[in-house]
Swiss-Prot record:
It comes from Ruthia magnifica subsp. Calyptogena magnifica. Disulfide bonds: none annotated. This is Large ribosomal subunit protein uL1. Keywords: Repressor, Ribonucleoprotein, Ribosomal protein, RNA-binding, rRNA-binding, Translation regulation, tRNA-binding. GO terms for biological process: regulation of translation; translation. Binds directly to 23S rRNA. The L1 stalk is quite mobile in the ribosome, and is involved in E site tRNA release. Protein L1 is also a translational repressor protein, it controls the translation of the L11 operon by binding to its mRNA. Part of the 50S ribosomal subunit. HAMAP family: Ribosomal_uL1_B (MF_01318_B). The keyword NAD does not apply. GO terms for cellular component: cytosolic large ribosomal subunit. It comes from the Bacteria. Transmembrane segments: none annotated. Belongs to the universal ribosomal protein uL1 family.
Length: 231
């Protein structure tokens, strides 16, 4: 086993592995432990009391975080007609139809979000095997299939988080950067938790929010006391 670095040892001294921290203390500790030379992301993982194998307990959606994520998002839009200029004016990185489809089929997939207007889905549908495995397939449930492409692009660019419970019933999401102040990070987390609360499946029984943990890109994972959140 490789020997721990001095930075790793310092983090271990600061972190109590079995402790459940208040959200304020957890975020302050992550910021204190952030030693990378880049602006690390702050990520949250929430264990939900759902049976992810049941289709009626599929938790997914999208929410615009009030303070953004601090991430530069590259957006591709499939649309035509008047929507081309609207998407471009909203900040889309590339807009197209068959030409964009061909580009993606050839391997140009350096996009974080793909948006499509309904009249473009005939083209986008041919990219199912390309976009689907990468989580890029436009979907009306998360607002990426819409006639209002300008709003969709703006949302993606200004901090929209798309989330989906995995097979274990856990939702993972980026909620900001270590450079954000604690208040901004807390607000983002509260907004995302409230969004999850609103779409709790009616068939899900028992405790819905089971466990919350947060971490930074290079830092420790910390358990958070759910009672310290405004939900």
């Amino acid at each position: 086993m490789a020997e721990l670095t001095k930075k790793q040892k310092d983090i271990l001294v600061k972190v109590e592995s079995n402790k459940c921290y208040s959200i304020n203390d957890a975020l302050n500790l992550l910021k204190e432990c952030a030693t990378a030379k880049f602006d690390e992301s702050i990520d949250m993982s929430i264990n939900l009391g759902i049976d992810a194998k049941k289709s009626d307990q599929n938790v997914r959606g999208a929410i615009v975080l009030p303070n953004g994520t601090g991430k530069t998002v590259c957006v591709a839009v499939f649309t035509q007609g008047d929507n081309i200029a609207k998407a471009q004016d909203a900040g889309a990185d590339v807009v197209g139809m068959e030409d964009l489809m061909k580009s993606m089929q050839d391997g140009d997939l350096n996009y974080d979000v793909v948006i499509a207007s309904p009249d473009a889905m005939g083209v986008v549908g041919r990219l199912g095997q390309v976009l689907g495995p990468r989580g890029l397939m436009p979907n009306p449930k998360v607002g990426t299939v819409t006639s209002d492409v300008a709003t969709a692009v703006n949302n993606a660019k200004t901090g929209q988080v798309r989330y989906r419970a995995d097979k274990a019933g856990i939702v993972h999401a980026c909620v900001g950067r270590v450079s954000f102040n604690v208040s901004a990070l807390t607000q983002n987390i509260n907004v995302l938790m409230e969004a999850l609360k609103k779409i709790k499946p009616s068939s899900a029984k028992g405790v819905y929010f089971k466990k919350l943990s947060i971490s930074s890109t290079m830092g420790p994972g910390l358990s958070v006391d759910l009672a310290s959140l405004d939900i």
